[in-house]
């Protein structure tokens, strides 16, 4: 078995067939040679894939979200993805804070999950969202077409190909720690690559399991200490279980 065979095997499985092939190949390439056999390599890759995607997206939740949208229930759809469910009660407060200076016309939503639906509810005219699971796009895109809403979904791994789109604001919710765990230095590199003058960056203050001791302080120290000089922190606030930074590019 070589990497191509392993890639084909993983993408043929029901659990991972909707994943971005670039993500699967990246992880297989990183794991190749670390294990005694190709079988162990594939098992290790599957474990990592579950950690970055499986805990957030299931076929059942996507099916239920699509049904909720068909019934016109956007809030129920948002409740069916782990990240948007966590912030649902604070959604208005969150976006009142993010849009306090101005309401953007075009938003880039990086590793978007189902969050673009919240932007639709806020009346954002144009949204470009990317994620590593095609099922998310398959849920949101038909809804956007029905509503004649300018939404584009890209199946894209930002560690393999940074977004080339331009916008007024980028949302990077709870993503940077995951990127940094995958590749050291990639989190700040992503911010530098984005073609928007302003960004909203968030960090979890608790894990999905509810543990949160020291998380907020640790993430704040890491982010504020490592943010490149070309950025300025405009504001920050803890809302619900997220620490939110509003930053802008200088010059």
Swiss-Prot record:
Entry-linked Pfam families: FmrO
Provide the residue positions that the database annotates as binding S-adenosyl-L-methionine.
56, 81-83, 87, 111, 131, 157-158, 173, 182
Q: Which GO terms describe its molecular function?
A: rRNA methyltransferase activity
EC number annotated for this UniProt entry: 2.1.1.179
**Where does the source fall among the domains of life?**
Bacteria
GO BP annotations listed? response to antibiotic
Catalytic activity, reaction form = guanosine(1405) in 16S rRNA + S-adenosyl-L-methionine = N(7)-methylguanosine(1405) in 16S rRNA + S-adenosyl-L-homocysteine
Q: What class of enzyme is it?
A: transferase
Could you list this entry's UniProt keywords, alphabetically sorted.
Answer: Antibiotic resistance, Methyltransferase, Plasmid, rRNA processing, S-adenosyl-L-methionine, Transferase
Q: Which family does it belong to?
A: Belongs to the methyltransferase superfamily. Aminoglycoside resistance family.
Function description: Specifically methylates the N(7) position of guanine 1405 in 16S rRNA. Confers resistance to various aminoglycosides, including kanamycin, tobramycin, amikacin, arbekacin, gentamicin, sisomicin and isepamicin.
Q: Which NCBIfam families match?
A: 16S_rRNA_Rmt_B, 16S_rRNA_Rmt_gen
Name this polypeptide is given? 16S rRNA (guanine(1405)-N(7))-methyltransferase
